Amino acid sequence: MGSLTDNAAIPTVDISAFLDPNASQEARQDVVNAMSNACHVYGFFNLAGHGIPQETLREAFELNKMFFALPEESKKEVLISKSIGQSFRGYEPPGIQTHHKGLLPDIKETFMVGREVPLDDPDCGTFSTGPNLWPSSLPKEKFQDRIMAYQGSMLELVKNILAILAQGLPKEWGCSPTVFNSLLDKPSIPMRFLHYAPVPSQLEDVRQFGVADHTDFGCVSILLQEPGTSGLEVYYPPSDSWIPVPVIDDGFVINMGDMMQRYTGGYYRSARHRVLTNREKHRHSVAFFLNGNLGLKAKALDGSETETVVGDWIRGRLIDTMGQTGKLLQRESPKPVVLP
């Protein structure tokens, strides 16, 4: 059975019945209803019953810590400024992103990986498209190959989430169960390995956050939080309050982004959220973002005629919030390399 249970007001949706070919239609519909309601009301939910092995999740944190344990010179070897054109991948040091005037830059540091696109691809170097950057000190089979395997698992998971979300749209809209499939054609799928260092009490500042109040820019976000950590909060307008999002064992946090909100005419809500600083604990997480097909002209499914080009929207939001790094997205895209 699909379940929608209240966990500090953030629902938990178990999708195991939807993935089970032997489940009844009623059980599958329960999952659809639960996820649709969670995304309509909260824009966030905890995901259980996803079928991804526990060892895969533990390995993701191992890879996260492997990268951030590198010396600074090794991390800077793959600085995001060294990515080709506007492909926007690699290492972001702390203090890069500022979401609102009057706040200090986020303390997070990030290693970002996207869909692997070869140098001779005609789109190479355009926004969010190109080869990934890998630190030379980490063996390919121990780091790169395992990261790309995890990315593949996330892509399969988001396909299932989109299938459920499509069936949860209002029936009167007449949408096909495959209405979101066009998002998956050569998708932009940035994946961020995140580290938040502790902020000692003597350095605390009310303007400082791990990540300040923001919404995600794309369609669907899948966040893996490390057990034993805290800090993620979601803004809930009816009570004008911030709701903590607890870590559930072997689960994910799923949220809708701005692009999904625009695509569904506001039916699926992109909720504001933030990450607080911690005085003592390091926080590690892994976030997978489905931006979608960057060239897709996404016309609002509610018939409101609003149309958004996926890549233009997300690129614009990054330029607005990423400071000097955002200027990388205004570089001229290089001509594709012709390989022998």
UniProtKB/Swiss-Prot annotation:
EC number: 1.14.-.-
Entry function: 2-oxoglutarate-dependent dioxygenase; part of the gene cluster that mediates the biosynthesis of xenovulene A, an unusual meroterpenoid that has potent inhibitory effects on the human gamma-aminobutyrate A (GABAA) benzodiazepine receptor. The first step of xenovulene A biosynthesis is the biosynthesis of 3-methylorcinaldehyde performed by the non-reducing polyketide synthase aspks1. The salicylate hydroxylase asL1 then catalyzes the oxidative dearomatization of 3-methylorcinaldehyde to yield a dearomatized hydroxycyclohexadione.
Protein name: 2-oxoglutarate-dependent dioxygenase asL3
InterPro entries: DIOX_N (IPR026992), IPNS-like_FE2OG_OXY (IPR044861), IPNS-like_sf (IPR027443), Iron_ascorbate_oxido_reductase (IPR050231), Oxoglu/Fe-dep_dioxygenase_dom (IPR005123)
Keyword line: Dioxygenase, Iron, Metal-binding, Oxidoreductase
Ligand binding (2-oxoglutarate): 283
Record GO biological process: small molecule biosynthetic process; terpenoid biosynthetic process
Free-text remark on how the cofactor is bound: Binds 1 Fe(2+) ion per subunit.
Family under the similarity heading: Belongs to the iron/ascorbate-dependent oxidoreductase family.
Applications reported: Xenovulene A is a natural product exhibiting little structural resemblance with classical benzodiazepines yet is able to displace high-affinity ligand binding to the benzodiazepine site of the gamma-aminobutyrate A (GABAA) receptor and could be potentially used as an anti-depressant with reduced addictive properties.
Protein origin, superkingdom: Eukaryota
PANTHER family on file: 2-OXOGLUTARATE (2OG) AND FE(II)-DEPENDENT OXYGENASE SUPERFAMILY PROTEIN-RELATED
Pathway field: Secondary metabolite biosynthesis; terpenoid biosynthesis
Cofactor: Fe(2+)
Residues of the Fe2OG dioxygenase domain: 187-292
GO MF, any single term: dioxygenase activity
Protein's organism: Sarocladium schorii
Enzyme class: oxidoreductase
Induction record: Expression is significantly up-regulated under xenovulene A producing condition.
Ligand binding (Fe cation): 214, 216, 273
